[in-house]
Amino acid sequence: MQLNSTEISELIKQRIAQFNVVSEAHNEGTIVSVSDGIIRVHGLADVMQGEMIALPGNRYAIALNLERDSVGAVVMGPYADLAEGMTVKCTGRILEVPVGRGLLGRVVNTLGAPIDGKGAIDNDGFSPIEVIAPGVIDRQSVDQPVQTGYKSVDAMIPIGRGQRELIIGDRQTGKTAMAIDAIINQRDSGIKCVYVAIGQKASTIANVVRKLEEHNALANTIVVVATASESAALQYLAPYAGCAMGEYFRDRGEDALIVYDDLSKQAVAYRQVSLLLRRPPGREAFPGDVFYLHSRLLERASRVSADYVERFTNGEVKGKTGSLTALPIIETQAGDVSAFVPTNVISITDGQIFLETNLFNSGIRPAVNPGISVSRVGGAAQTKIIKKLSGGIRTALAQYRELAAFSQFASDLDEATRKQLSHGQKVTELLKQKQYAPMSVAQQGLVLFAAERGFLNDVELAKIGSFEAALLAYADRDHAELMADINQSGNYNGEIEEKLKGLLETFKATQSW
C-alpha cells in the first residue's frame, strides 16, 4: 500500500490535533529550615500573604512572613518529619473551611474536619476564614434581643442580635458557664450557635459537648475545637474558622450566636507564632498587630440589612436581615482589666459583662458586677416587659452598694435607709441563678414585677429563693396562658400589669413557700 504526500500530511495534521499537551506550572520552593512549627522556604516567587503552601504528606503551611529571599510559613499540624531540602508548592488558595447546615450538631477542628467519630460532614461548600467585615452601608441597627436566660444579664446588660458583648473575669468565675447557658437558651429561638474552644483541655471540651447534648442544644450548635495540645497556628486560626461557619447563616438572612472561649489564649498563641517568625515584640511581648488580630475578627459580628442578604443570595432570600452576635471571653489576671489584651477587646466590643471573684466566692452567681458591666447598644433591643420592669433594679443595687459601705461605720440607721438596705439585699438574692437553668421572658418578667412592686417586702431574705421557685411553679401551672402570651409578645401594658398583680396577690394569699 502506498500513501501519497497529501494523505501523509492529513494524517500528521490529525495526529497533531489529537495530541493533548497537559502541562501544569507549579511554583515550587525548598525548605531551608524547620523549627517549632515554623518553616523557612527559599524559591517561592509568587506566593501571597496568607496563601496555603502544600507540604509533603498532604499537609499545608500558611505563608505569614514574605521576606526578600525567603518565606516564613507556619505548619498546620505535625512537623516533626519535615526536613531541610524538601520541596513545597504554592496552591494559589487561601485557607478555606467547610460551611453549611451539615455542621450543626458536630464537633470539628480548626480546618473543619470532624473529630466526633460521627462520620463525614455533608457541607454546602467552602468559605475563606479571612473575610472583610460588612461595610457601614450594609449594616442595620441592633433592635432584636438575644435572651441569655439570666435575669441579671437580660435585665441590666441586655444583648441584641448583631452585638459584640465581652464576658470578662478571672479564672473560675463562671465565664464559660454563662456562655454555655446562653447557647442552651437558644435551642427554641431559631438562633444557630457556634462555640469555639481555644487552648482548652480536651476533657473540659468533652464535658461542654456532653452538657449541650443533655440539654438538647447540640443539634443547634457547631463546636470548633483547638485543644491545648494542638499547634499554636491552629489555636490562633480557630476563631476565624468558627466565624466563617457563623457567617454562613448571617449572610442567608438568619441569626447566629458565636462564643470565643477564650481570646486571651488566642492572643498568646498568636504571640508565640509571631515571636517564632522573629517579628518585633511590643507591650507584654505581643506583636504590634494584636489589636488588629481581634478587631478584624469581632467586626465580622454584625446585623446586616435585607438588601445585603438579597444581594448575597442573588435574590433567593428577600426581606430578611441576618445577624451574627459575638460573645468573646477574656480571662484577666487578679482582676486587672487594664492589661493589654483586655483593654483592646473592651475598646472593640459593644459592652462587657464583668464577673468578679469576690462575688463568686460569696455565693452570688452569676457573679456579675453591675457597677462596671455595661451594654452599649442592647437597650434598644430589650423586650418591652423586661425594659419596663428592670429600670429600678440597677438603681436599687447601686444605692444598696453605696449604703452597704456607709452602714459599716454607722451605728444607728433611720427607717428609710434600713428599707433600702433590705430591698437591695433581696434584689441581690433574687438575681442569683443556678447553672443550666435559663429562664423565659415571662418568668423573668414575673420575678422582676414582684421585686419592683414591693411583693418581696414581707418575705424573709433566707426564703427569697424558695419564694421564687414556688412562684414560678404556680405561674406555670395555674397561669400557663398568661405566661405563654408574655413569652409570645414580650409586651407590657395595663392589662398584663393587672393580671400579674392579681397572680401575685393570689399566690401570696393561697400558697406557701
UniProtKB/Swiss-Prot annotation:
Pfam families according to UniProt: ATP-synt_ab (PF00006), ATP-synt_ab_C (PF00306), ATP-synt_ab_N (PF02874)
GO function term, MF aspect, one: proton-transporting ATP synthase activity, rotational mechanism
Subcellular location per the Swiss-Prot or TrEMBL entry: Cell inner membrane
Membrane topology value: Peripheral membrane protein
GO cellular component labels: plasma membrane; proton-transporting ATP synthase complex
Top-level EC class as recorded in UniProt: translocase
Keyword check for Transferase: no
Family: Belongs to the ATPase alpha/beta chains family.
Keywords: ATP synthesis, ATP-binding, Cell inner membrane, Cell membrane, CF(1), Hydrogen ion transport, Ion transport, Membrane, Nucleotide-binding, Translocase, Transport
Signal peptide boundaries: none
Binding site for ATP: G169, D170, R171, Q172, T173, G174, K175, T176
Keyword Magnesium: no
Name this protein carries in UniProt: ATP synthase subunit alpha
Lineage: Bacteria, Pseudomonadati, Pseudomonadota, Gammaproteobacteria, Enterobacterales
EC number: 7.1.2.2
Residues with site note (Required for activity): S373
Species: Erwinia tasmaniensis (strain DSM 17950 / CFBP 7177 / CIP 109463 / NCPPB 4357 / Et1/99)
Function in brief: Produces ATP from ADP in the presence of a proton gradient across the membrane. The alpha chain is a regulatory subunit.
Complex formation: F-type ATPases have 2 components, CF(1) - the catalytic core - and CF(0) - the membrane proton channel. CF(1) has five subunits: alpha(3), beta(3), gamma(1), delta(1), epsilon(1). CF(0) has three main subunits: a(1), b(2) and c(9-12). The alpha and beta chains form an alternating ring which encloses part of the gamma chain. CF(1) is attached to CF(0) by a central stalk formed by the gamma and epsilon chains, while a peripheral stalk is formed by the delta and b chains.
Catalytic activity: ATP + H2O + 4 H(+)(in) = ADP + phosphate + 5 H(+)(out)
